């Protein structure tokens, strides 16, 4: 399949990952992209979803829409995260099947993996345990996309695939302290501390947990590659192939933002999953994907983007 001659529907297309996927589709020659925005279409309402497909008439669906957040947001809203993600996925795939969509790309999450899966995570270990408790409702909801896609492939010969991105970062991320993930949260804290002349930044947890991070533009490229080239029922990991502790991450962000004060780790806050890192062999062998943005470069771009956006907001509110 080539996206250049297809009508592509991208749910969540104006979000953090979505805007980069739309840009990547355009780089691959796709000129007919429909972006679904929440204020225009509620994917948890079947009537909205039905109308969407009748209007857009897509050949391909890339389902990115999700209710997401960091450890705190997952802890406070487990029911919302489960229900809304399950409903959006189930309704979107069902109506894609009904109208004869040629390819459905379900974008899952590393949170689907068992809490104590061997590191690096292999796709074959996806069902060998329950996800980490702090984000299990979200992870299980996204995992249902995989189950539904495999069931539809078996019963209806519906071409659905499932990709598993690791933690993402980059420009246009969510920097809201109430719901952001670790990188934007630390970037914001350090930048604000520098501006305020503060001598301390408080980080959640022990700092011992490890994570892998994939630059958002690299992930977008991987998703389009998978759309064109991957046609198997098995899930496929999308990652950068490295692992870093939260403590080392915080020190790196502090250095890049110019924060020279003290990093304090609040051990009363949860670490989340002890380790996260993906084996990316399947993606490399199946559609030639390898991340091209090294971590310090990606962080620098993210920090600079945040500083520019912060300055713009300061001007508009002055």
Outline where the language-model segments fall.
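N-terminal Rossmann NAD(P)H-binding glycine-rich loop of SDR-like oxidoreductase domains
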Residues: 6-28
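C-terminal substrate-binding subdomain of Rossmann-fold SDR/epimerase-dehydratase oxidoreductases
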Residues: 22-28, 192-318
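Adenosine-cofactor binding site in Rossmann-like domains, unifying the SAM/SAH pocket
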Residues: 28-51
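Flexible, glycine-rich beta-alpha linker
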Residues: 42, 112-114, 137, 161-183, ...
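NAD(P)H-binding glycine-rich loop region in Rossmannoid oxidoreductase-like domains
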Residues: 46-85, 98, 115
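Short-chain dehydrogenase/reductase
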Residues: 82, 86, 134-146, 176-184, ...
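Conserved Rossmann-fold NAD(P)-dependent oxidoreductase catalytic core, especially the SDR/UDP-sugar
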Residues: 90-135, 161
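Active-site Tyr-X1-5-Lys
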Residues: 133-166, 185-195
């Amino acid at each position: 399949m080539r996206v250049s001659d297809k009508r592509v529907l991208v749910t969540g297309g104006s979000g953090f990952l979505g805007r980069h996927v739309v840009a990547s589709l355009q780089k691959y020659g796709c000129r007919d992209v429909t972006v679904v925005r929440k204020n225009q279409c509620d994917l948890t309402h079947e009537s909205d979803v039905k109308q969407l497909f009748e209007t857009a008439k897509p050949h391909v669906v890339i389902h990115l829409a999700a209710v997401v957040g960091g450890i705190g947001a997952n802890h406070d809203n487990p029911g919302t995260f489960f229900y809304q993600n399950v409903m959006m996925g189930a309704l979107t795939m069902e109506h894609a099947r009904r109208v004869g969509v040629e390819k459905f790309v379900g974008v899952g999450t590393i949170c689907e993996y068992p809490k104590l899966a061997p590191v690096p995570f292999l796709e074959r270990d996806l069902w060998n345990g329950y996800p980490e408790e702090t984000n299990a409702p979200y992870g299980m909801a996204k995992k249902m996309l995989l189950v539904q896609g495999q069931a539809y492939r078996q019963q209806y010969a519906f071409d659905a695939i499932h990709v598993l991105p690791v933690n993402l970062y980059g420009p246009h991320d969510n920097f809201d302290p109430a719901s952001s993930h670790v990188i934007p949260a630390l970037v914001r804290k350090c930048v604000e501390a520098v501006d305020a002349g503060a001598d301390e930044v408080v980080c959640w947890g022990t700092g011992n947990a490890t994570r892998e991070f994939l630059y958002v533009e690299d992930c977008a490229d991987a998703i389009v590659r998978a759309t064109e080239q991957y046609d198997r029922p098995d899930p496929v990991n999308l990652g950068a192939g490295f692992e870093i502790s939260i403590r080392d991450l915080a020190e790196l962000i502090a250095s890049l933002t110019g924060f020279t004060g003290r990093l304090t780790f609040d051990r009363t806050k949860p670490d989340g999953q002890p380790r996260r890192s993906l084996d990316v062999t399947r993606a490399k062998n199946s559609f030639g994907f390898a991340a091209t943005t090294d971590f310090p470069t990606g962080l620098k771009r993210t920090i600079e983007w945040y500083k520019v956006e912060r300055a713009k907001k300061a001007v508009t509110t002055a």
